[in-house]
């Protein structure tokens, strides 16, 4: 569930994720 859910928002939320820190969290991994 978390994999597909992140894949969808990650593509369109890439900019928002970087601002919120979602992409940063993935990079930290």
UniProtKB/Swiss-Prot annotation:
Broad class of the protein's primary localization: nucleus
Molecular function GO terms recorded: DNA binding
Region named Disordered: 1-29
Post-translational modification: Monoubiquitination at the C-terminal Lys gives a specific tag for epigenetic transcriptional activation and is also prerequisite for histone H3 'Lys-4' and 'Lys-79' methylation. Phosphorylated during apoptosis; which facilitates apoptotic chromatin condensation.
Keyword Endoplasmic reticulum in record: no
Localization in the cell: Nucleus; Chromosome
Organism domain of life: Eukaryota
Its biological purpose: Core component of nucleosome. Nucleosomes wrap and compact DNA into chromatin, limiting DNA accessibility to the cellular machineries which require DNA as a template. Histones thereby play a central role in transcription regulation, DNA repair, DNA replication and chromosomal stability. DNA accessibility is regulated via a complex set of post-translational modifications of histones, also called histone code, and nucleosome remodeling.
Family the UniProt entry places it in: Belongs to the histone H2B family.
Name of the protein in its database record: Histone H2B
């Amino acid at each position: 569930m978390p994999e597909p859910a992140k894949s969808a928002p990650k593509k369109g939320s890439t900019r928002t994720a970087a601002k919120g820190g979602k992409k940063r969290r993935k990079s930290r991994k």
